[in-house]
Regions:
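Polysaccharide-binding surfaces and accessory modules of carbohydrate-active proteins
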Residues: 1-242
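Carbohydrate-binding surfaces of carbohydrate-active enzymes
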Residues: 245
Length: 245
């Protein structure tokens, strides 16, 4: 597995995951907006634009002001961890991505610390936010993404559900900057209820598949999110996956 970090002209930092055997197929210049590593919302924050209310709290006013402060790699516990730091006002965020020897998966979490004397109410904090899920070509490739989910009412008993992104309405809109989000995950106090906290993404043409799940002893959800970047040149889009408990 290969991970690449990117920083745009606005100082936002994001990353891309691909199989190591496919890293040379990543397009050098993305035609989509960089997905920030940190997604959070404070009480009183502005919502992220048209029709976002009720769909998502991501891309809040605080996220737009967060700045990158540093990155380091730490080798410990039989693996290595990449810590990327950010700050806004008196809040400090650390995005931790950990690789363990012998595993073809990585663990991701985000921590936040209030270093000021003013109380801040954190309404939402994503454990991870991963965009650019198919970084192998530019533009829109219709009916090329299969999304896998696992409906369940108890424990690990579930069936596998497969749908195209278009079937879940994760498609571009004719309204510039419109936001659309599909969420699922754990609700209530049962081990699982409604959906196992898992999602798989398959690039049909490239025969590449990745899966994501969260581990938290509380209700939480995974969100699939799409937002176009504008009509100035071509309409371009990517699906983003986020999780929080």
């Amino acid at each position: 597995m290969t991970v690449r970090y990117y920083k745009d002209d606005m100082g936002k930092v994001g990353f891309v995951f691909v199989p190591t055997s496919m890293k040379k197929q990543i397009v050098p210049e993305f035609d989509c907006r960089l997905e920030p590593l940190i997604q959070c919302k404070l009480v009183g924050d502005a919502y992220p634009g048209p029709f976002a209310c009720g769909h998502t709290m991501r891309d809040s006013g605080t996220v737009k002001r967060i700045s990158f402060t540093g990155q380091e790699e730490i080798r410990a516990d039989g693996g290595r961890r990449i810590e990327t730091s950010f700050a806004v006002d008196e809040l400090s965020f650390v995005h931790k991505l950990t690789f363990f020897e012998g595993y073809d998966a990585a663990e991701c979490c985000v921590s936040v610390e209030n270093k000021g004397g003013v109380t801040v109410s954190l309404e939402m904090l994503h454990s991870f936010s991963l965009g650019m899920l198919t970084p192998f070509e530019n533009g829109i490739h219709k009916e090329n993404l299969n999304l896998y989910r696992m409906p369940s009412r108890w424990a690990s008993e579930a069936h596998l559900e497969k749908k195209l992104a278009e079937e879940l309405l994760l498609v571009p809109s004719f309204l510039e900057e419109e936001i659309f989000c599909v969420s699922h995950g754990q609700i209530g106090s049962k081990p699982t209820d409604h959906y196992i906290p898992f999602v798989g993404i398959e690039d049909i043409e490239k025969k590449c598949c990745g899966a994501h799940r969260y581990h938290v002893q509380a209700p939480g959800k995974l969100s699939l999110f799409v937002r176009i970047t504008g009509f100035q040149s071509a309409v371009v889009w990517r699906i983003t996956i986020t999780a929080h408990g």
